[in-house]
Amino acid sequence: MHIWVDADACPAVIKDILFRAAQRWQRPLTLVANQMLRTPPSPLIRAIQVPRGFDVADGYIVEHAGSGDLVITGDIPLAAQVLEKQALVLSPRGERYTADTIRERLSMRDMMEELRSAGIDTGGPAAFSQADRRAFANALDRLMLASARA
């Protein structure tokens, strides 16, 4: 299982959890972003800087992620694309996206986009919390354990 991270919007605390998990579980970890990223020295961890542009990092992840890989992203369209390739998807808040749940998330995203286009303030996501951090760490551990048993 290769771990791919949509790193532009991924919180630093989540990246730190992923760095430790890559070492602990001996899994390759690739962070993809349109900016320079710092990573700890490890043969398992690398950062890919893609050119700036709309969905360039997403396109890189879609192109390279494969069946059984894990993709970390809060980007619903990206999640839908990699799910089609049989990858696993986990949000930085610890929500596991599946083929069943992604349709609902895409519909909700589209509805919120329509409201914003109509000038309605829909607010933003809640601030990232300790509970989100714990939820992510726990969900990641469950996925890593399941992968190790397979």
From Swiss-Prot:
InterPro entries the UniProt entry points to: UPF0178 (IPR003791)
Disulfide cysteine pairs (residue numbers): none
Classification via CDD domains: PIN_YqxD-like
NCBIfam families per record: PRK00124.1
Family: Belongs to the UPF0178 family.
Name under which the protein is recorded: UPF0178 protein Bpet3884
Organism: Bordetella petrii (strain ATCC BAA-461 / DSM 12804 / CCUG 43448)
